[in-house]
Structures are given as structure tokens and as C-alpha cells.
Amino acid sequence: MGQALFLTVLLPVLFGVGPEAYGEASHSHSPASGRYIQQMLDQRCQEIAAELCQSGLRKMCVPSSRIVARNAVGITHQNTLQWRCFDTASLLESNQENNGVNCVDDCGHTIPCPGGVHRQNSNHATRHEILSKLVEEGVQRFCSPYQASANKYCNDKFPGTIARRSKGFGNNVEVAWRCYEKASLLYSVYAECASNCGTTWYCPGGRRGTSTELDKRHYTEEEGIRQAIGSVDSPCSEVEVCLPKDENPPLCLDESGQISRTGGGPPSQPPEMQQPADRSDERGGGKEQSPGGEAQPDHPTKGGNIDLPEKSTSPEKTPKTEIHGDSTKATLEEGQQLTLTFISTKLDVAVGSCHSLVANFLDGFLKFQTGSNSAFDVVEVEEPAGPAVLTIGLGHKGRLAVVLDYTRLNAALGSAAYVVEDSGCSSSEEVSFQGVGSGATLVVTTLGESPTAVSA
């Protein structure tokens, strides 16, 4: 049948670019996680715990997977927010009053994440200076200049807020660019941020669409944030296609889809937030002092709790269709790709009569079938939870490539992909989607554009 199965990413498949240009492809690596600084901190904390264990501190002799970095208070007398290495077994399942914990996004902003500190019986080591330095270094590597500009716009207008494209107050309010109070966001919920090409992709720090008092703490600034993003110079020339990367700078592709060069380095990052002072306490105890420059929860000025919707007059660079209902159709031409962003337990897709696939999140698999073949090939999908992004690309002579990026139960990102060399598909096929769920969006782009770029 000429089928070949690869775990890879879409652009190298269709353009023949080697994996070394994009990083090693695997289930554990997926673009735009927005969690790389947090992963750096977790890894450093695991090293610190191992060092403390070797030095004789037995309570830190625990499996490395239990050690994480969190910005939080400590035991009873440690009342300031500092970076600490926690044994997750000592954390509470939920926070109460002022014992919440925070994780960090790739622009250095702390956002509430699951868990709470047991003030009387916490097993942690405070390493504020070491971890704060890693945050500063990580911002230069991973913070998109476009997202930094959007954050600066929000912070200048409403001090203490950051930019996200997410939900507002209640589930019926449409997704839009807003300036959010950080304490009102959830690190475990994905929103959209600006990539280092100016397109949007997923990042931590979103809203569930609930109707609590915290859900009121934002300002809708669609036009202003879009203008802030648009004010950043493109890293690629007008004749090149910008390919976002997790780490700055992005890649620039020529008209044939080959890498022509690496995009220009990121501009100096705006002072989006005051970094916590580089201080740490002794692990054995002692009264913790509150550093003067330590970041505390910020609140919007002028009363907060105000939603000022504004309609954007700036056209989107990538046309996007918001789907109303549980199904939709689109035409896929040779040299194009369809990207569907959805939250659903099961998605059925038919590419004309030449190819079909099923993404089943309940049973954890992506299966596909080509032409008249009655048997399905299956690709494992590990612990899927959602949201998910499905990209289908049609190359030369019916070459079909499919990539499914999804959120896992542990809030990490997963990816599954396959390629059919000779699918039997023509140069133009109608693609139908069934079971897309509510709030799905569909975008048609040319090959070479970011698979997750669902809007400008």
C-alpha cells in the first residue's frame, strides 16, 4: 500500500527537512508548551534534592519525580512568596487562603497551579536566588518577543496583568485577547499566546469559563493587544515563511519550504515584571525575611473587575472559521494543510473517499485507513485529556501527513503523527469532521505555516 509510519512533525515530513532542524520528535516533545522554564526549575530542584540527600538530609531522599519547583510560602514563619523545591507528597491537594502555589510561564510570570502548602508539615528547600536566576535566563531563551510586547501593553495599561487569548466571565463569553490578573488564571488550563512568529499557539494560564469573582478580573483589549503584537518587527523577510520554535529565534523558510536561515534574535525583553529578589533562607530554619523586591500578587488598578470589550479592526493574517455545531467540512488542496482545534472525546474525519481517521480520546488511540483497505493502522495516544490540535497536510502525489497534538492528563503535551506516502487522494479533496465538540475552530493554511497558528 505504500504506507509509512513515522513519529515526527508535519513540516519536516512534507518538506523533507531533517529532524535536527526542529529538535528530536517524540511523544514527550510538542511545540508551544509554554512550560520550558518551569521544566528547567523542576529539573534543578531534583538535582538540589539529590545533593541534600547525599549530604545527609534524609527527608529529601525521595524519588526525583516527586520534586518540583513552586513559588509559594513555606512553613508557618515563612510568609513570603519565594522559589522553593517541594516534595509533592507534602503538598495539599488544594490551596486554602494564602497557601497557594505558583508555577512560571515562559515569560517569567507566576500563575497559580494545583496544590497548596502544608504550613505545619511541608517538606521543601528554599532556593530563591538560584531558581530566580534560572527564570531570568529562561525568559531570554523562551519568551516570544510578540508575547512580551502583548504583556507589556497589558501591564502598562493595567498594572499586574498579562495578555492571554482565553475566556472571560462565564462559558458563553467568546474567546478574546484580554489583560488578565495573574491570580485569576489557572496554570493547568491552556490559553493562547503569541508565538515568536506572531501567530498564536497554546500556553499555560487560561480560564475554564466559570463564573466566580476571580473570573471577573480581566479587561478585554482585543484591538490594543493585536496592535502591540503587530508592532514587533518580523524576524523573517517578506518572501520567507516564519516557523515558530519553542526557543528563540524562530526559523525562516524559503518558498520551497527549506530552511533559509534562523530568524533574527529576539529584541530585548520589556520590563514586564519585577523579578523576585535573589535571596534564600537556610534549609534548617531561621526566620525568613521578606525581600523588598519580591514579586507579590498584582491587582489591576481602578477597581478591577471591569470588562471593556473592544472589537478589533485589524484583519487576521490567517483566516479562521469558528464552528457552530458538531460537524464541519472544508476543501483541502495540494500544498495546503487544515488545522482543527477542538475539545472532544472522539473525532471522525474523512478525506474524500481516499482516507479516514478516528481520534479516540476515551480509549487512547489514533487510527487511520486508506482507500479500499479494510484494516486500520493504529497510533497510540498517551493519556489524552484535551484540548487538541489536528493538522492534515496534502503534499505532492497524494502524500498525506497527519499530526495530533494534545494535552495529557498530567497537563504535559503529547503528540502522535503518521504519513501515508501514496494515499490515493487527488489534488483536491473534501474533508469532513464529525464530533468536533463546542468551541472548535478550523483554519486552512499553505504548507510551511505554523500548524498551531489558528489566528494572527
Curated annotation (Swiss-Prot):
Region (Beta-finger region that is required for the interaction with and correct trafficking of MIC4), start-end ranges: 237-256
Source domain of life: Eukaryota
Motif mapping: CXXCG: 103-107, 193-197
Region (Disordered): 247-330
Activity regulation, per record: Sialyllactose inhibits binding to fetuin, a host glycoprotein. Lactose and D-galactose (beta-galactosides), but not glucose, mannose, fucose, melibiose or heparin, inhibit hemagglutination induced by MIC1.
GO annotation, biological process: cell adhesion; effector-mediated perturbation of host innate immune response by symbiont; effector-mediated suppression of host innate immune response; immune system process; symbiont-mediated perturbation of host receptor-mediated signal transduction
Keyword tags: Cell adhesion, Cytoplasmic vesicle, Disulfide bond, Host endosome, Immunity, Lectin, Signal, Virulence
Signal sequence, renumbered to the chain: 1-16
Segments for region (MAR domain): 17-262
Region named Interaction with host sialylated oligosaccharide chains: 124-126, 216-220
A Pfam entry, by short name: MAR_sialic_bdg
Location within or outside the cell: Cytoplasmic vesicle, Secretory vesicle, Microneme; Host early endosome
GO molecular function, one term: host cell surface binding
Cystine connections: C45-C85, C53-C61, C103-C113, C107-C143, C154-C179, C193-C203, C197-C242, C236-C252, C354-C425
Predominant localisation class: cytoplasm
Domain notes: The galectin-like domain has been demonstrated not to bind lactose, glucose, maltose, mannose, heparin, fucose, L-arabinose, N-acetyl-D-galactosamine, or N-acetyl-D-glucosamine. It interacts directly with the second and the third EGF-like domain of MIC6, and with part of the acidic domain. The MAR (micronemal adhesive repeat) domain was at first proposed to be TSR1-like (thrombospondin type 1-like repeat) by PubMed:9027753, but PubMed:17491595 found that this domain represents a previously unknown protein fold. This domain is jointly responsible for interacting with MIC4 and for host-cell adhesion.
Function comment: Soluble adhesin with carbohydrate-binding activity. Binds to sialic acid-terminating oligosaccharides. Required for attachment of the parasite to the host cell and subsequent invasion. Ensures correct folding of MIC6 and transport of the MIC6-MIC1-MIC4 complex into the micronemes. Facilitates the correct targeting of MIC4 to the micronemes. Triggers the activation of murine bone marrow-derived dendritic cells and macrophages and production of pro-inflammatory cytokines, such as IL12 (IL12B/IL12A), in host TLR2/TLR4-dependent manner.
Quaternary state and interactors: Monomer. May form homotrimers. Part of the MIC6-MIC1-MIC4 complex. Interacts (via the beta-finger region) directly with MIC4 (via the second apple domain). Interacts directly with MIC6. Interacts with murine TLR2; the interaction promotes activation of bone marrow-derived dendritic cells and macrophages in the host. Interacts with murine TLR4, the interaction promotes activation of bone marrow-derived dendritic cells and macrophages in the host.
Protein name per Swiss-Prot or TrEMBL: Micronemal protein 1
Gene: MIC1
